[in-house]
């Protein structure tokens, strides 16, 4: 927090910049230059989003933590003034509400229904299964022709197979589900197409929950079916929860696998250290540093003030939206004074990043993502020690049109 004189927010500045800001294509790992400028010069400011409204943009790590843990900051997307990502996201929040978009106590009540499978103990017990999936996919890479698209061959299949098994979703339906998910998260999806995809996804999951009512398995959707029968939630609620877990459970992890591998390939000395080390702490800290450095969920955390809140010498009034660019907080020199713009797998406080958000809405699957990344990076580099980029960095198609950063393809060879 800063010691500036307390001021109240009046009308938004006429020169509020457009949001989201564009990345510099020559620096694909970096936050947009405009975001870095706000962090350095105006850490609490306004920006203009798609509907013409001007929510607050909070860039400093300390301010983000303070607000994301403040009960006066609401995640209720139905509140007037909530800064939705797009018109389609606004529609989705109203048509298919999820517990992730609710406040306590309702958020906590629903979250507790799905927490058990994501506890550290449960996830650690899944390591052998995740290792087996990873080895099978790398076997396929080694047996096939080169170059290989790492996204298609490894980065996407690992988290998709894992989350499908956890949810009880048939893996053979993955293409249908992935197409719908893509339509919902692309910034440039034609208005209405995301809505159609969301409806199709919700109907699919609602029907699947219906089948679980009479034929339960050892999976999350079956657990939700029990709650439906008990009258704790509706079948639509269960479908909405499943939809959120399905999307969040694979998209960001798939992007991290591919983009993190690319970042290591661009830092060969650090890659070699990760590959050759027998110390498990090395891969653990490498994953934390990659999460900090890349911050896949670059523009997903939005909130609204439920009451007037003073922070950093500014009053954010009730009903005003707040945008949290996590990539700015994770490059904040106040927390990371030593070259935050560089990858450093030995960074001592890397784990203090906000890549999974913060507060009661922190990512439910954070432990799962960490374990998947640890297994995939270490196994890939150990089994293919000469892994290399097949082409040049400027040929890689980056996901600049999505709310989650990543690459569409990553051709590799060895």
From Swiss-Prot:
Disruption phenotype: No longer produces the 16-membered macrolide antibiotics FD-891 or FD-892 and instead makes 25-O-methyl-FD-892. Double gfsF-gfsG deletions make a diastereomeric mxiture of 25-oxo-FD-892. The keyword Ribosomal protein does not apply. Its cofactor is heme b. The macrolide antibiotics FD-891 and FD-892 induce morphological changes of human promyelocytic leukemia (HL-60) cells and have cytocidal activity against tumor cell lines in vitro. FD-891 produced by Streptomyces sp. MAFF 225003 and MAFF 225006 inhibits growth of rice and alfalfa seedlings and may cause russet scab in potatoes. It is an enzyme of class 1 (oxidoreductase). Changing residue 300 to A: 93% epoxidation, 13% hydroxylation activity on FD-892. Pfam families: p450 (PF00067). Belongs to the cytochrome P450 family. It comes from Streptomyces halstedii. It comes from the Bacteria. PROSITE patterns: CYTOCHROME_P450. Monomer. The gene is gfsF. Its EC number is 1.14.-.-. GO terms for biological process: antibiotic biosynthetic process. One of its GO terms (molecular function) is heme binding. Gene3D superfamilies: Cytochrome P450 (1.10.630.10). Involved in the synthesis of the 16-membered macrolide antibiotics FD-891 and FD-892. Consecutively catalyzes epoxidation of C8-C9 and then hydroxylation at C10 to convert 25-O-methyl-FD-892 to FD-891. Consecutively catalyzes epoxidation of C8-C9 and then hydroxylation at C10 to convert 8,9-epoxy-FD-892 to 25-O-demethyl-FD-891 as well as converting 25-oxo-FD-892 to 8,9-epoxy-25-oxo-FD-892 and 8,9-epoxy-10-hydroxy-25-oxo-FD-892. In vitro is furnished with P.putida putidaredoxin and putidaredoxin reductase to provide the required two-electron reduction. This is Cytochrome P450 GfsF. Pathway: Antibiotic biosynthesis. Keywords: Antibiotic biosynthesis, Heme, Iron, Metal-binding, Monooxygenase, Oxidoreductase. Residues 1-32 are annotated as: Disordered. Heme b binds at residues 75, 107, 111, 303, 361, 363. InterPro entries: Cyt_P450, Cyt_P450_B, Cyt_P450_CS, Cyt_P450_sf.
